[in-house]
């Protein structure tokens, strides 16, 4: 399946290309999606009853979204304002960011949006793609990871 990479430009600044849910969908790794579903069900209990197919996501701006992303105040706000993302909004950071339900995501948003605003979309994407690698072994990592699964180095990428 050919992917539309513009679907990965989440308006909030969380580049979907480094999201483990997106990567598991891309790789058709249903076992990993099931594990992620159990993890996310701790914060979003309604996810527990969903099938792995219902957990798949093709990126924030696609038609197929992870359940907790289907209702997104940030995406709705950006679309209502007719702007590309929070980086183009004079009100950033706002109550939508303050109320973001996932602490690691909120931290990444607060880091990424100013960079996106200052450097533009392509530089922001490149920066996000480069950031999420293990500094010890160069293994590809994902947002929220605290330890490299290959060399077990502790990482603080967000």
For each feature predicted by the language model, list its residue ranges.
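Short cysteine-rich clusters marking metal-coordination/redox-active sites
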Residues: 57, 86, 134-137, 148-151
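Hydrophobic scaffolds flanking metal-cofactor catalytic centers in soluble metalloenzymes
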Residues: 1-87, 91-118
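Phosphate/adenylate-binding glycine loop and adjacent helical scaffold
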Residues: 3, 17, 136, 154-158
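Ferredoxin-like iron-sulfur electron-transfer modules
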Residues: 7, 48, 54, 122-140
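Short Cys/His-rich micro-motifs in 6-15 aa windows
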Residues: 77, 94, 152-158
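Broad hydrophobic/π-residue packing in well-ordered secondary structure
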Residues: 94, 123-127, 147
């Amino acid at each position: 399946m050919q992917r539309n990479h513009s679907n990965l430009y989440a308006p909030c600044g969380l580049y979907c290309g480094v999201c483990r849910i997106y990567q598991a969908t891309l790789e058709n790794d249903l076992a990993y999606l099931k594990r992620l579903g159990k993890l996310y069900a701790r914060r979003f209990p309604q996810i527990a009853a969903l099938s792995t197919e219902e957990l798949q996501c093709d990126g924030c701006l696609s038609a197929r979204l992870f359940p907790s992303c289907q209702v997104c105040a940030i995406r709705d706000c950006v679309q209502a304002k007719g702007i590309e993302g929070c980086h183009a909004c004079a009100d950033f950071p706002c109550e939508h960011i303050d109320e973001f339900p996932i602490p690691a995501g909120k931290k990444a948003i607060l880091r990424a949006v100013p960079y996106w605003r200052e450097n533009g979309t392509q530089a922001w994407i490149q920066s996000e793609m480069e950031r999420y690698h293990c500094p010890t072994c160069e293994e590809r990592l994902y947002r929220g990871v605290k330890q490299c699964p290959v060399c077990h180095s502790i990482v603080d990428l967000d």
